[in-house]
Amino acid sequence: MVFMNKTLLVSSLIACLSIASVNVYAEGESSISIGYAQSRVKEDGYKLDKNPRGFNLKYRYEFNNDWGVIGSFAQTRRGFEESVDGFKLIDGDFKYYSVTAGPVFRINEYVSLYGLLGAGHGKAKVSSIFGQSESRSKTSLAYGAGLQFNPHPNFVIDASYEYSKLDDVKVGTWMLGAGYRF
């Protein structure tokens, strides 16, 4: 009987420590992901023939099992030109950068939802063969939302959308990435 009580006590102690360590397990965890970004740029109904493409980098920190914070950096770029009979008349370049951050809520052990708020910066430069050149840049509010999936405890799949309006230029950016959770 004494042996059985000791076994029950040790088993209960191990179970309690296991449960406590599961709660602590998510606290302080981080993840980093890198991925593909593609923007769609519109101005007064006109859009670029080819979408600017680039990359996205995200870092996430979990405060506890439910809440965390995420930071994001995105960059997309597209060069373009107008030619007549192989003769280049106009050369242009569009670049977009954003830095955003926001809260993360873990729905379950596999899925988390997050919101983003920060700054988006766009720069367009156009030059012609006649020596004329024009450049415009604008920084404005950027906001978005996304999901992170953890199909495996150490693997992250990230998908998000971000929007920014730079005066009359509207930039919507889709991002898809993968990363490591540690």
From Swiss-Prot:
InterPro entries: Bact_OM_Invasion-Related (IPR051723), Enterovir_OMP (IPR000758), OMP/PagP_b-brl (IPR011250), OMP_b-brl (IPR027385). It comes from the Bacteria. SUPFAM superfamilies: OMPA-like (SSF56925). Gene3D superfamilies: 2.40.160.20. It is found in: Cell outer membrane. Pfam families: OMP_b-brl. Disulfide bonds: none annotated. Residues 1-26 form the signal peptide. Promotes the invasion of pathogenic bacteria into eukaryotic cells by an unknown mechanism. This is Attachment invasion locus protein. The lineage of its organism: Bacteria, Pseudomonadati, Pseudomonadota, Gammaproteobacteria, Enterobacterales.
